[in-house]
């Protein structure tokens, strides 16, 4: 099993380095939060006959890196597995068992539904929060200027 835990911008570089070593039985997944775009990119460059089954564990925090690792990071957290028309069913089964073994609850959906759901529940609130902070900062600067 290979789990991509890197930024999406690194996927292509990594796949091109490992492509010749991949076997049809190799289970490849990722833990990114954007699925449609990543799956589209991966399909274009992944060697024929190799299956990619995307995962999205809904766990973590605002900090990253191994120094912030937690023993029970996935305990009782959702992990979304992405199932498309050509997804290898055996890989879905193995990944489902894997994520459950580390404590996750597993749900399965297609990439379009995933990205729609998470753009509204995760990405949109972040965008609103960033804009709120910027508006407050700009307002504070304007108030200083007027004083």
Task: Annotate each language-model stretch with its function.
Residues 1-3, 29:
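N-terminal Rossmann-like NAD(P) cofactor-binding module of classical short-chain dehydrogenase/reductase
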Residues 3-5, 59-60:
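Short acidic/polar alpha-helix capping motifs at helix-coil junctions
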Residues 5-7, 32, 83:
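Glycine-rich, N-terminal phosphate-binding loop of Rossmann-like dinucleotide-binding domains
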Residues 14-66:
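Rossmann-like NAD(P)(H) cofactor-binding subdomain of soluble oxidoreductases
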Residues 71-147:
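Internal alpha-helical scaffold of NAD(P)-dependent oxidoreductase catalytic cores
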């Amino acid at each position: 099993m290979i789990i991509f835990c890197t930024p999406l911008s690194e996927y292509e570089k990594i796949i091109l380095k490992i492509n010749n070593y991949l076997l049809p039985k190799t289970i490849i997944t990722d833990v990114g939060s954007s699925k449609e775009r990543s799956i589209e990119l991966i399909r274009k460059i992944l060697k024929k006959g190799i299956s990619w089954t995307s995962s999205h564990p809904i766990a973590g925090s605002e900090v990253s890196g191994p120094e912030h690792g937690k023993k029970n990071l996935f305990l009782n957290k959702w992990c979304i597995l992405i199932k498309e028309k050509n997804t290898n069913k055996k890989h879905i089964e193995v990944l489902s068992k894997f994520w459950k073994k580390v404590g996750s609850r597993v749900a399965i959906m297609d990439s379009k539904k995933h990205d729609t759901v998470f753009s509204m529940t995760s990405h949109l609130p972040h965008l609103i929060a960033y804009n709120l902070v910027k508006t407050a900062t700009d307002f504070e600067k304007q108030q200083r200027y007027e004083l």
